[in-house]
């Protein structure tokens, strides 16, 4: 992950965390949307060893999920990272604290789906998360309007950008939020597993 170009001062990097169980075209779709809308230089896919809000039942091994992400990352601007496993961080708030400390010269943006913004108050120390890096929210089918009315969005109303100003987000100091406009992807890891399109081994 720590290639020389990734450490260029001022580089704008989106962080997309997830189980990637498996990685799929939807991940690629939202990544390219965020790259374009936010003017990012890179997006790091942070493959989680174990999402604390998800059961490990039906979860493939970390190495298999990492390999799935590497296979799907068909864009040179995407960097698949195992840094959460190497850091031993369990919660997003700790991962972000470690990354911003290790790479203070990089302008990080946390990328999350509208469905996850709704759940954000259930995340560990979520108010510390929003104070650490700006957050970009990409649309998800059935959740986009609910996300705009969610408690987290309400708490961040005064620091929310218009979608037309989203490219400014990486330049801002947290807290800052932007909802991105764009086509929604209906693909999900759950539906792929339910169709039998993903083996746990």
Swiss-Prot record:
It is an enzyme of class 2 (transferase). One of its GO terms (molecular function) is ATP binding. Pathway: Cofactor biosynthesis; NAD(+) biosynthesis; deamido-NAD(+) from nicotinate D-ribonucleotide: step 1/1. The keyword Kinase does not apply. The keyword NAD applies. Gene3D superfamilies: HUPs. Keywords: ATP-binding, NAD, Nucleotide-binding, Nucleotidyltransferase, Pyridine nucleotide biosynthesis, Transferase. It catalyses: nicotinate beta-D-ribonucleotide + ATP + H(+) = deamido-NAD(+) + diphosphate. One of its GO terms (biological process) is NAD biosynthetic process. Residues 182-201 are annotated as: Disordered. Residues 192-201 have a biased composition (Basic and acidic residues). Its EC number is 2.7.7.18. It holds the Pfam family CTP_transf_like. SUPFAM superfamilies: Nucleotidylyl transferase (SSF52374). Belongs to the NadD family. Catalyzes the reversible adenylation of nicotinate mononucleotide (NaMN) to nicotinic acid adenine dinucleotide (NaAD). This is Probable nicotinate-nucleotide adenylyltransferase. It comes from Parvibaculum lavamentivorans (strain DS-1 / DSM 13023 / NCIMB 13966). The lineage of its organism: Bacteria, Pseudomonadati, Pseudomonadota, Alphaproteobacteria, Hyphomicrobiales. The gene is nadD.
């Amino acid at each position: 992950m720590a290639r020389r170009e990734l450490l260029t001062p001022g580089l704008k990097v989106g962080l997309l965390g997830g189980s990637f169980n498996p990685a799929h075209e939807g991940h690629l779709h939202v990544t390219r949307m965020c790259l374009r809308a936010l003017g990012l230089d890179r997006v790091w896919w942070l493959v989680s060893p174990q999402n604390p809000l998800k059961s490990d039942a039906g979860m493939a091994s970390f190495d298999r999920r990492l390999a799935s992400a590497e296979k799907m990352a068909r864009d040179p601007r995407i960097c698949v990272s195992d840094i959460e496993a190497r850091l031993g961080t369990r919660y997003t708030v700790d991962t972000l604290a470690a990354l911003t400390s290790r790479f203070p010269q990089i302008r990080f943006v946390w990328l999350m789906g509208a469905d996850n913004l709704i759940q954000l108050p259930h995340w560990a120390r979520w108010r510390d998360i929003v104070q650490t890096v700006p957050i970009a929210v990409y649309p998800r089918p059935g959740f986009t309007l609910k996300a705009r009315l969610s408690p987290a969005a309400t708490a961040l109303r005064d620091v929310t950008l218009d979608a037309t100003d989203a490219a400014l987000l990486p330049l801002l100091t947290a807290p800052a939020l932007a909802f991105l406009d764009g086509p929604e992807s209906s693909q999900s890891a759950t539906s792929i597993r339910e169709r039998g399109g993903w083996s746990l081994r």
